[in-house]
């Protein structure tokens, strides 16, 4: 082991021992980035971009049976107040610039969930001349939720996967 590797492992050991001592006294030792990610996962605000029948399932997720707000996710009507955009339904060539414009209005960090076969890859209308073959050609997508239409449980699982992804990745990089 080189001196550089030894110094790094000693530092980790010192941090772990200090963390154990502080936990016994009721304190928490963490990084600012972990704290920010923890807060961000518990307060995601999603904006709907419902274009077709998948939007109905998106509404079911907000209803009392599934109650997505218990996970800290709440709907917002304005892109300037939202962190997550859920694209649900068939995206046409005519609607693509509007999707990009709304995405650009969202503050950083912003996340996109593509919901349903039509948003993921064009779906049933894949070979139509006027359909975009996946919203990932217009905006970067973080989570894909498959199905036609996907169930509310599938969307809920996708939201939980997004929260896990936010916890795993840093605040600077996406």
From Swiss-Prot:
PROSITE patterns, A to Z: COMPLEX1_20K (PS01150)
GO CC entries: plasma membrane; respiratory chain complex I
Pfam families according to UniProt: Oxidored_q6 (PF01058)
SUPFAM superfamilies documented for this protein: HydA/Nqo6-like
InterPro entries (UniProt xref): NADH_UbQ_OxRdtase-like_20kDa, NADH_UQ_OxRdtase_20Kd_su
One Gene Ontology MF term: NADH dehydrogenase (ubiquinone) activity
Role: NDH-1 shuttles electrons from NADH, via FMN and iron-sulfur (Fe-S) centers, to quinones in the respiratory chain. The immediate electron acceptor for the enzyme in this species is believed to be ubiquinone. Couples the redox reaction to proton translocation (for every two electrons transferred, four hydrogen ions are translocated across the cytoplasmic membrane), and thus conserves the redox energy in a proton gradient.
Descriptive protein name: NADH-quinone oxidoreductase subunit B 1
Gene name of the record: nuoB1
